[in-house]
Amino acid sequence: MTEARPVATERAYPALSREYPADFRVDDSYKASLPDLQNGPASLIVGARAPIQHVGISNFRLPIRYQTQEGGEIALETSVTGTVSLEADRKGINMSRIMRSFYAHAEKQFSMGVLEAALEDYKSDLGSFDARIMMRLSYPMRVESLRSGLSGWQYYDIALELSERAGQRLRIMHFDYVYSSTCPCSLELAEHARQMRGQLATPHSQRSIARISVVMQGDTLWFEDMVTLCRRAVATETQVMVKREDEQAFAELNAANPIFVEDAVRAFAAELMAEPRIGDFRVVASHQESLHSHDAVSVLTQGETFAHASLDPAIFAGLRA
């Protein structure tokens, strides 16, 4: 005969309030009693006791004020990613400190000096050796049409990156430039059909994009400077406001500047090499073909900063013109 199990009583589990205590106030003593697992002992580490190069938060958004090259100011929604290194014998980090450190500087007008101060703060707050901040924004510039006199806003996707590793600090700008590329081969074939057979034919062209990453050195490299540099390299930037005369002008501009993807990355590289405010760089270009069901792509790097034996699998997938 089995023994009867004891009947559970209400005292086995405390009665819990199911109402939110809006009037509850936290004092220092209560805060000191709160558990903090991320700062726990190394015995709590899960998995390999290995150092982590990047741990933090991604895509917290806030408005940041930027100065234009002409001296004006513009507030733009900015997405921020902040990470630090973590030593092998440390359990984790308090990620909210990254946000708090950044917010302490968020009301200031942006400059690389402000960004460096934010980096120093959260590196110090978290007791880390290495740290990185990346800010992503879309920067508007008014662009004139080619012939009609109209103008419209062109937006440039930009990421600013400040990183410190082993005491070496890098200031990097990633800049997306969208342009039209007319295939030189297709242009010649279309002309051949016209001349040899009186056959109307049109060359194929496509929206294309270059992501240009540069190490900034020396004097300020303005966003507007990058736009000017890219336009010198590849003149066929996509248009904003267009009337018929602008569309015709753009067709003429493309015919005057046919370009393969290999030509494009080298044209950008020539301008980047000539700019003393730019050190190492990388150009990733994608011509999103209208003839083929695939894209034509190319990568050109200068210096060690962006040189890798392996390509990120998403390096071209992330380029959507």
UniProtKB/Swiss-Prot annotation:
Pathway membership: Cofactor biosynthesis; 7,8-dihydroneopterin triphosphate biosynthesis; 7,8-dihydroneopterin triphosphate from GTP: step 1/1
Site (May be catalytically important): 183
Its EC number(s): 3.5.4.16
Residues that span the membrane, as ranges: none
Keywords, in A-Z order: Hydrolase
Record-level GO BP terms: tetrahydrofolate biosynthetic process
Coiled-coil blocks: none
A Pfam family reported for this protein in Swiss-Prot or TrEMBL: GCHY-1
Enzymatic reactions: GTP + H2O = 7,8-dihydroneopterin 3'-triphosphate + formate + H(+)
GO MF terms held by the record: GTP cyclohydrolase I activity
Function: Converts GTP to 7,8-dihydroneopterin triphosphate.
Family: Belongs to the GTP cyclohydrolase IV family.
Name used for this protein in its record: GTP cyclohydrolase FolE2
Organismal lineage: Bacteria, Pseudomonadati, Pseudomonadota, Alphaproteobacteria, Rhodobacterales
Gene that encodes it: folE2
